[in-house]
Amino acid sequence: MKLYLAAFLGAVATPGAFAHQIHGILLVNGTETPEWKYVRDVAWEGAYEPEKYPNTEFFKTPPQTDINNPNITCGRNAFDSASKTETADILAGSEVGFRVSWDGNGKYGVFWHPGPGQIYLSRAPNDDLEDYRGDGDWFKIATGAAVSNTEWLLWNKHDFNFTIPKTTPPGKYLMRIEQFMPSTVEYSQWYVNCAHVNIIGPGGGTPTGFARFPGTYTVDDPGIKVPLNQIVNSGELPQDQLRLLEYKPPGPALWTG
């Protein structure tokens, strides 16, 4: 445990660490849309240093570490870009996704941290996305967890693809991606972004199981703070002792329509 804790805290404390990412690209039926066209842009972390990092996107990649901070909703100061974010028309029942637009190594990066991803929807009051901070109710429509006892679905992948439930009530929503690395300590890194989407379809479903961000998660929730056998890169357990398939993600149950 001491070995894992030291490695974990050392990695997260390293300035300019490469293991960060942002998801500024929305995928619609497998088609890439322009970066930050439909996803709320986020602010830099700290001071921009053009002599060291000429691309400003690098400074958008650091995670949220306080799950009680309003930035956990859609990313760092994301509401500031709401008025210039366009809204994508999405057919209920179709496949959509988020693509990692930048990581520590450059454009079109990957999900660096071994851990799950989840997708939530929140209907904008009066279908007004420009004035909606995301402080209402969210329901979960997708989880990308483990595919085996030793491998996470998203780790080192470029995209997180999922399907909008067929009976989702039509209207304008914030669509939120979260990806994070569970740990054995009460500390986690969160990579969150939100897209503007207009869901078109027959409706008929009634979403259930709501969450709020911030508000629903705590640092010691199961799924955020986990046992050592659900940590891929601890260095303390052999592969055959890992049990990722026993992992239960935080938040409400999936709503599938």
From Swiss-Prot:
GO terms for molecular function: metal ion binding; monooxygenase activity. It is found in: Secreted. Residues 1-19 form the signal peptide. Glycans are attached at N29, N71, N161. Lignocellulose is the most abundant polymeric composite on Earth and is a recalcitrant but promising renewable substrate for industrial biotechnology applications. Together with cellobiose dehydrogenases (CDHs) an enzymatic system capable of oxidative cellulose cleavage is formed, which increases the efficiency of cellulases and put LPMOs at focus of biofuel research. Its EC number is 1.14.99.56. InterPro entries: AA9, AA9_LPMO. Cu(2+) binds at H20, H113, Y191. Binds 1 copper ion per subunit. Belongs to the polysaccharide monooxygenase AA9 family. This is AA9 family lytic polysaccharide monooxygenase U. It comes from Thermothielavioides terrestris (strain ATCC 38088 / NRRL 8126) (Thielavia terrestris).
